[in-house]
A protein has these predicted regions:
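Short, compositionally biased
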Residues: 43-49, 80-91, 142-166, 184-199
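Short beta-strands and strand-coil junctions in structured, solvent-facing domains, enriched
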Residues: 15-16, 38-39, 50, 60-61, ...
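Conserved "cap/hinge" positions at secondary-structure junctions
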Residues: 19, 33, 70-71, 90, ...
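P-loop NTPase catalytic core
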Residues: 221-222, 228-551, 564
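Short alpha-helix capping/helix-loop boundary micro-motifs
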Residues: 14-18, 50-56, 113-124, 158-162, ...
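C-terminal amphipathic alpha-helical interaction region
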Residues: 539-584
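P-loop NTPase nucleotide-binding/switch module
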Residues: 97-152, 169-229, 244-247, 282-299, ...
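N-terminal accessory targeting/assembly segments
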Residues: 1-103
Length: 584
C-alpha cells in the first residue's frame, strides 16, 4: 500500500506534505494539481511533515492537493538503447516530447520497449555469478552492450538457464538465476538504479595508470588527464569553457561520451544536437552521436532538476563502465548545480555557509567526484569513468566556494584566464595556474616513459620553467622598457612566447590543428624545447624579436599542415635551417 499525503505548505518549488504513513529520505512522489502530476523528491522529513522539491513549476498548486509516494528513490532506467538519446535531467526522452516548450508534468519512456535486439549469450547454465556479472550482449550502435546481473542482486547466484541467441525485446527474460536458498530470479535486459547511490559492483578501484588523450595540446602535453581521473575547468564568462569541452568530447579517446548540460544556455545544447550527428569520430569512423548521450537541463528548465541531471549522467556512466568501457562524463556547468543546492538550502532555512552555499557543499562535491575512477570488474576486466566538469565563478573569482571545494576533489585544474581569452590565446588555459596532479603518480610516470618518451615528465616541467621565466622577464621589460634590460631578458621572454604560440595555443575550428595526436605533440614539443635550450647571439632586442616572430610563423604554418605530409616536412626543414643560421 503506497503512502499518500496532502499539500500543507508551499515555498516556491518546496512543498510541505502532511503524510499519512512512513516516508523515506530522497523518496520520489507525485504531486497532483488538477489532471497534472508532477514528480518531486523528498529532501527532509520532520515527524509527519515531508519537505519535497518539485521538478516542475508549482504555479496553481494549492493546500490540500493530493500527493502519492512511490516507495523508491529517483531511479534511472538502464537498458540497451540509451546511446544517441537526448534526455532531460529526469531521463525523459526529449525527442518524444511535442511542441517548442516542455509541458508541465511531461513524462516519456527513456528507452524503446518495443525494439528488438540481437542477443548473444556469454554465460552458461551452472556458472556462478554476482551483481554486474555478464550474462550476454547485444550490439548497440557499434558498442557491445553487456546484459548484466542487476546491480540490486547482491548475493551469489547460479545460472539456471540463459536465452539462446536471437532477437528479443528488453522486457523478455534473458536468464534465470538460482540463489543459495533455491529460489529462482528472472533477469531481463532492463534494470533500475537510484541515481544518488554509487554503483559499487567491482572488486578493486586501483589508481589511474594511463592518460586519456584529448587531442588538446595544453592538456595532453602540459597537464594530462588520466583515464578514470577527475578534472575541472573554471573560468569567467566568454573564456571558452564550452568550446573546450566540445573539442574534448569530439576528440577524446573514450568509448562512450555523456554530456550533461546543467543550467547552460539552450543554444549551446542545440549546437551539439545539430553538430554531433554530422561529425565523424576519428577513432571509429562512426558519427559522434553514436557514442554520445546528452542530458540536457538548460537554464530555463526547473532548477531542482539540475541536481538530478548530474547524478543521472554519472549513474549512466557507471553502468557503461561495468561493461568494461572507457566512459567520459562532462558536466557544464557544476556551478549551476551548486546554485540549485543553494536555493534548496535557503528555502529549507538551513544554516548558510560562505556566499550562502550549503555548509556541506565541499562534502557533496567530493562525494560526487569520488564516483569517477578506474575499476576492476567482477570478471577481471577493467572499465573507467573520467569526469570533467566546468565551473563558472561569478566575476571570474577563483577563490569562491564552488571552485575551492572542487579544487579539493579534482586532480586536474585547467584554469581559463580572462587575460589570455582577451588576447585571443585559445584555449585560454593558464599554463602557470593550471596543474595535473597525475604527473606526480609513479604509475603515470611509468606509462609516459614507456609510451611517449623516457623522462617525459621532466621535459614537461622544463617547459613550465621556461614559461615561468618568460613571464618574469616580461614583467621586468614592462617596468624598465625595452632598452632598460639586457637582451637576454628579451630572449627569455620570446622563448616562452614560442612555447605559448606553438604548444599552448590551438585552433579548435581548423580541421587539422583541432585534433593533435600524441605522437605529433611529442615531436613538436621536443623540437620547440630543443630551440629553447639553444644559445643565441642577438645584436639587440629588435633582432631577437624579428627572429622569434619569423620562427613562430613557420611553426604556426606547420601546425596547420597534415602530419608527416610533404608540406609538414618542408616547414620542419625550413625551421632547422632558420635556427642554424642564427645559432652561436
Amino acid at each position: 500500500m503506497k503512502t499518500t499525503g496532502r499539500v500543507n505548505g508551499i515555498i516556491s518549488n518546496i512543498v510541505i506534505v502532511k503524510a499519512d504513513g512512513p516516508v523515506g529520505q530522497n523518496e520520489i512522489c507525485y504531486v497532483w494539481t488538477g489532471d497534472t502530476k508532477m514528480m518531486a523528491e523528498v529532501i527532509k522529513v520532520i515527524g509527519d511533515a515531508a519537505y519535497v522539491q518539485v521538478f516542475d513549476s508549482t504555479r496553481g498548486l494549492k493546500i490540500g492537493d493530493r500527493v502519492e509516494f512511490e516507495g523508491h528513490m529517483l531511479e534511472v532506467t538502464l537498458a540497451p538503447g540509451l546511446l544517441s538519446r537526448n534526455y532531460d535531467g529526469l531521463q525523459n526522452d526529449l525527442e518524444k516530447m511535442d511542441g517548442l516548450f516542455i509541458a508541465r508534468g511531461s513524462i516519456t519512456d527513456p528507452v524503446d520497449y518495443d525494439a528488438e535486439w540481437e542477443f548473444s549469450p556469454l554465460a552458461k547454465a551452472g556458472d556462478k555469478v554476482t551483481a554486474a556479472s555478464w550474462l550476454g550482449e547485444v550490439k548497440e550502435q557499434w558498442v557491445m552492450h553487456k546484459i548484466m546481473v542487476p546491480f540490486t542482486m547482491t548475493d551469489s547466484y547460479t545460472v539456471k538457464s540463459v536465452a539462446e541467441a536471437g532477437k528479443y525485446k528488453i522486457t523478455d527474460t534473458m536468464a534465470v538465476l538460482t540463489d543459495a536458498e533455491g529460489r529462482d530470479h528472472e533477469v531481463t535486459m532492463v534494470q533500475k538504479w537510484p541515481v544518488k547511490q554509487a554503483v559499487c559492483c567491482y572488486t578493486e578501484k586501483p589508481r589511474p595508470s594511463r592518460i586519456m588523450e584529448t587531442g588538446v595540446r595544453p592538456i595532453d602535453t602540459f597537464n594530462p588527464m588520466a583515464e578514470g581521473g577527475t578534472g575541472f575547468i573554471p573560468g569567467p564568462f566568454g573564456a571558452g569553457k564550452t568550446v573546450l569541452q566540445h573539442a574534448i568530447s569530439k576528440q577524446a579517446d573514450a568509448d562512450v561520451i555523456i554530456m550533461v548540460a546543467c543550467g547552460e544556455r539552450a543554444n549551446e545544447v542545440v549546437e551539439i544536437f545539430k553538430e554531433f550527428p554530422e561529425l565523424i569520430d576519428p577513432h571509429t569512423g562512426h558519427t559522434l552521436m553514436e557514442r554520445t548521450i546528452i542530458i540536457c537541463n538548460t537554464s530555463n528548465m526547473p532548477v531542482a532538476a539540475r541536481e538530478a541531471s548530474v547524478y543521472t549522467g554519472m549513474t549512466i556512466g557507471e553502468y557503461y563502465r561495468s561493461m568494461g568501457l572507457k566512459v567520459l562524463v562532462m558536466a557544464d556547468s557544476t556551478s549551476r548545480w551548486a546554485q540549485a543546492l543553494r536555493e534548496m538550502s535557503n528555502r529549507l532555512e538551513e544554516l548558510p555557509g560562505q556566499d550562502a552555499f550549503p555548509m556541506d557543499l565541499s562534502a557533496i562535491i567530493s562525494n560526487f567526484y569520488s564516483r569517477a575512477g578506474l575499476v576492476k570488474l567482477v570478471g577481471g576486466q577493467t572499465g573507467s569513468v573520467t569526469f570533467l566538469g566546468t565551473v563558472s565563478p561569478a566575476g571570474g573569482n577563483l577563490k569562491e566556494p564552488v571552485t575551492e571545494s572542487t579544487k579539493k576533489a579534482a586532480r586536474c585544474f585547467y584554469a581559463l584566464s580572462q587575460g589570455r581569452a582577451d588576447s585571443k590565446r585559445y584555449p585560454a588555459i593558464d599554463p602557470l595556474e593550471s596543474y595535473s596532479k597525475y604527473l606526480e603518480y609513479p604509475e603515470i610516470r611509468e606509462y609516459l616513459d614507456e609510451h611517449i618518451e623516457k623522462d617525459w615528465v621532466d621535459l614537461v616541467y622544463a617547459g613550465k620553467t621556461i614559461v615561468q621565466r618568460g613571464k618574469e622577464a616580461n614583467d621586468q621589460i614592462n617596468i624598465l622598457g625595452d632598452d632598460g634590460v639586457p637582451v637576454e631578458y628579451h630572449e627569455r621572454f620570446w622563448k616562452s612566447e614560442l612555447i605559448d604560440f606553438v604548444i599552448l595555443q590551438q585552433d579548435a575550428f581548423d580541421d587539422i590543428d583541432a585534433n593533435c595526436p600524441m605522437e605529433r605533440q611529442q615531436m613538436m614539443y621536443k623540437m620547440v624545447l630543443g630551440i629553447c635550450n639553444q644559445e643565441f647571439a642577438f645584436a639587440d632586442f629588435e633582432a631577437c624579436s624579428q627572429f622569434f616572430k619569423g620562427l613562430i610563423n613557420l611553426f604556426r604554418q606547420m601546425n596547420y599542415s597534415e602530419w608527416k605530409s610533404e608540406k609538414f616536412e618542408g616547414y620542419r626543414k625550413q625551421i632547422e635551417q632558420y635556427v642554424s643560421e642564427q645559432s652561436k
